[in-house]
A protein has these predicted regions:
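Short aromatic/hydrophobic "clamp" motif used to bind/position activated sugar donors
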Residues: 55
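Catalytic-site signature of metal-activated, phosphate-bearing donor transferases
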Residues: 41-47, 58, 64-189
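Start-of-helix register in tetratricopeptide repeats
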Residues: 169, 203-207, 241
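A conserved acidic beta->alpha catalytic loop
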Residues: 1, 13-22, 35, 59-62
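Short coil turns that delineate tetratricopeptide repeat
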Residues: 164-165, 199, 237
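Conserved donor nucleotide-binding strand/loop of the catalytic core
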Residues: 22-45, 49
Length: 257
């Protein structure tokens, strides 16, 4: 889906055991990067190979739909070098018809000469700076169905075992990993620790209230689960997902009476 949109393609292989490397070599230079449990290190290595004015990053399971491909080509033609970062929609949730139900903006196009650096061993990101522009060419995440991996959780646990401290973003995603693996009591502790951090992003804190509520519900602490949801009201205007979760708890409790 990305053939022809870029002036060069830099592919970094972190140790695939299928035919990824052979297939990728047909489209651009493939650099090997020994896996070291650090996604930022791999991305920073890949970014160091880029030689064009702007660097666009995509994961192996990201695609451009035909309409978004045309939007990206039009955006590319418009770039005059004044933008340092171009934020583009990232579609990650879909309904049964394949229509996007959730998206966020990601730092998708970055000026190469600005030497942006990825941060975070897992769920890595680049902190946007400089002249930031928004576009409408969406990237679609098409993750193949598979069992939920414990890779990310192990990376976090290895970091903690080494005595490293997680920043706010890392603490948030660590709590989510614990929740996904049904380690509910630990998830409660991790979500509470994140919510106590002053520098956590508001959106992450709202989602943490949802995650905390889910963990408490699984532990049978339904009243605490409700209070966890209402804590998000002090952060921002009540979100629909939070209100629906609170209503679901109340409805279930009323039916049980």
């Amino acid at each position: 889906s990305v053939r022809g949109i870029a002036d060069e393609i830099c592919i970094t292989d972190t140790g695939s055991t299928d035919k990824t490397r052979e297939i990728a070599q047909k489209y651009g230079t493939v650099q090997a990067f020994p896996w070291c449990d650090d996604f930022s290190a791999a991305r920073n290595f890949s970014f160091a190979q880029a030689r064009m004015d702007y660097t666009l990053w995509l994961d192996a399971d990201d695609v451009l739909l035909p309409s978004d491909r045309q939007k990206l080509l039009a955006l590319k033609a418009e770039l005059d070098g004044t933008a340092d970062v171009v934020m583009l929609p990232y579609h990650t949730g879909f309904d049964e018809q394949g229509r996007p139900t959730f998206f966020c903006y990601r730092e998708r196009l970055l000026k190469t000469s600005a030497h942006f650096r990825w941060q975070g061993a897992v769920h890595e990101c680049i902190v946007p700076r400089g002249n930031i522009r928004y576009g409408d060419a969406a990237v679609t995440h098409r993750k193949p169905p598979c069992a939920y991996s414990d890779r990310n959780l192990k990376i976090y646990e290895n970091l903690l075992a080494k005595g490293e401290k997680l920043d706010a973003r890392g603490s948030y995603y660590y709590a989510r990993e614990l929740l996904a693996h049904k380690r509910y009591a630990q998830a409660v502790e991790a979500f509470e620790a994140f919510l106590a951090m002053p520098d956590g992003w508001t959106e992450n804190k709202i989602d943490a209230c949802l995650g905390l509520s889910q963990a408490l519900t699984a532990l049978g602490e339904r009243e605490q689960a409700k209070r966890a949801l209402t804590r998000s009201f002090a952060l921002e205007v009540p979100r629909s997902a939070v209100c629906c979760a609170l209503a679901a708890l109340e409805y279930a409790d009323n039916r049980a009476r």
